[in-house]
Amino acid sequence: MMRKTLVIMAAGIGSRFGQGIKQLAKVGTSGELIMDYSIRDAMEAGFNHVVFVIRRQLADEFKQIIGDRVAGIVDVDYAYQEISDVPEPYAERFAQRTKPWGTGQAILACRDLVDGPFLVINADDYYGREAYVKAADMLEKVSGKDKGLTVGMISFILGKTLSDNGSVTRGICALNPDGTLNSICETKNIVKTEEGAGVQTDEGIVPLDVNAPVSMNMWVFPQSFMGVLKERFDQFLSALDQEDLKSEYLLPILIGQMLEEGRVAVQVETSQDQWFGMTYQEDVPAVKEAIRGMVDAGIYPESLY
């Protein structure tokens, strides 16, 4: 039986979240994390292998808080995202760097743990059950052979991904007539408005289509994508100034570049579910309330374990 792998990116540092590690915030009715619900939804959709991408210094705490209990219900592996995990010529060149390299390198960290198509998600995002069903179906459709690279993306409705507590950055997607991805525009400073959504600028708010599809870093890749990631990471590093200690190797930007070059086709399925996450510390009560509501509605049990 093919392993259906869920890769959870949990190594990032939430610069706007405040105190604590947002991936480990307890939001469930019995102290569960958002990841617990993601894993439960993924398993119900047929996923049977979880790879946590974490920071090595958090390993013991991570396993104690969530990893060990998840290992009781599904196969679990750990990948460690390390700043020093770069091709040999660049290790010394960027020795002063302290900022993680971004989502592209996070996926590369699990290159030896993934043996088939896989789904990538953020640890601190709740995507909803529908998204995992769509993603599981996409595992059969992605490929890196014959006519080139085909990957998948689950998009969400912009208006269902906003925060009441500040601005957010979203990858706003333009689709082709056949439903494939045409482009992603990383858009910062998106806020809720009375009309729906807009971009906060110095001149005021520029309205956005509240129903536009957006990327929330929920990607489906063939195993062969690891080779592409490795090759492109080398190119990214070779073009980077030695003094630049902040630029990141990011999945949406990489996919956008490959789309422009005609090197990839991205199949898109849009989930109608409400997304929620924790960009800000102030988002936590709303997440807890949303989960409480789903428990009361019978979508989840009072305790997942």
Feature-to-residue mapping (PLM):
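N-terminal glycine-rich phosphate-binding loop and ensuing alpha1 helix
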Residues: 2-67, 74-76, 81, 116
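A short, conserved beta-strand element in the Rossmann-like catalytic core
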Residues: 14, 126-128
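Short phosphate-binding loop-to-helix
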Residues: 70-117
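Short, surface-exposed amphipathic charged segments that create phosphate/polyanion-binding patches used
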Residues: 87-98, 166-171, 282-286
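Short beta-strand-to-loop acidic/aromatic patch adjacent to the donor-nucleotide binding site
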Residues: 116-126
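Conserved core of the sugar-phosphate nucleotidyltransferase
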Residues: 129-219, 223
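A C-terminal functional module that forms or caps the active site or interfaces directly
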Residues: 230-264
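Hydrophobic helical membrane-anchoring modules
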Residues: 265, 275-305
